[in-house]
Amino acid sequence: MGLDGGTIPTRCELVKTKKKEVKVFDKDQVDFGKWFLCALAQDTLSEPIVLDDLGNLFNKDNIIEALLNGSLETSKNFSHIRSLRSIYTVNFSPNPAHEKDSTVSPWLCPITKIEVGSSNYKFKFLKTCGHVFSEKAFKELKNDDSNNNNNNNNNNKKEIDSSKDNLSCFLCSKEYITNDLITINPSGEEFEQMKVTLQEKLANSKKKSSKKSDKKPDNKKRSLESNLASESSFTSNTLAQTNEEISKKMKSEAFSSIFKSNSNNDTTKTPNK
């Protein structure tokens, strides 16, 4: 059977099939997982919460368990976590508007009141104390400081410049430096830069450990030599004391023998009188 054009249609042209659904990358769901689920076990974050040098959030109990069973050593993304020294305790500021099973974030920035996990804002973590602030808070407070500095006299410029290095936490006033700041859940170029920084840190720690291991044999050799020297000095002192005692004993025996011979002579002479 043909149509007007003289062509014979195939079955696939006559039967309509349902189109496959194309899965769209849901950025909001991914962000939710990063901010409120443990990066290792994917369970809900609950205190104590910890952070690594790449800005990943974990439940501390999951990290401890993974360290004990050795699963982190073969992990593709978290092999840099080698001990509890590789993580930092996070002290989030609680959000009073949060309720259980609600979509409101359980934490917020104590300065700007921005909820933690907002996709339009970055959050910074302080290694020294564990507090978390939005990047906007750092910018706003920095602008306030610069405005105050501009109002000061020129005579105080040196004091102002020297105080720039003395950074302190907005909550606990604990001092820190710029290297103590970690971006939580970074993305793009910042994440790649943090990976490079972490690799350099691990390489430097390996160099330091290798230097320490090279110095250990020398220390052992020195300690062995000192022990041998002390033992030899002890032996020589012991021999000297022994020789001195023997000489004293010989002198005392000689003196006693002379005294006995004199006494015997006196006894033999008395009967003749």
Curated annotation (Swiss-Prot):
Keyword hit for Ribosomal protein: no
Composition skew (Basic and acidic residues), residue ranges: 211-224
UniProt xrefs under InterPro entries: Rtf2, Rtf2_RING-finger
CDD domains with a match to the protein in the record: RING-like_Rtf2
Superkingdom of this protein's organism: Eukaryota
Residue segments, region Disordered: 202-247
Record keyword Cytoplasm present: no
GO biological process: mitotic DNA replication termination
Any one GO cellular component localisation term in the record: nucleus
UniProtKB keywords: Chromosome
Localization (cell): Chromosome
Biased segments, Polar residues type: 225-244
Function summary: Replication termination factor which is a component of the elongating replisome. Interacts with nascent DNA.
Similarity-based family: Belongs to the rtf2 family.
Protein name per Swiss-Prot or TrEMBL: Replication termination factor 2
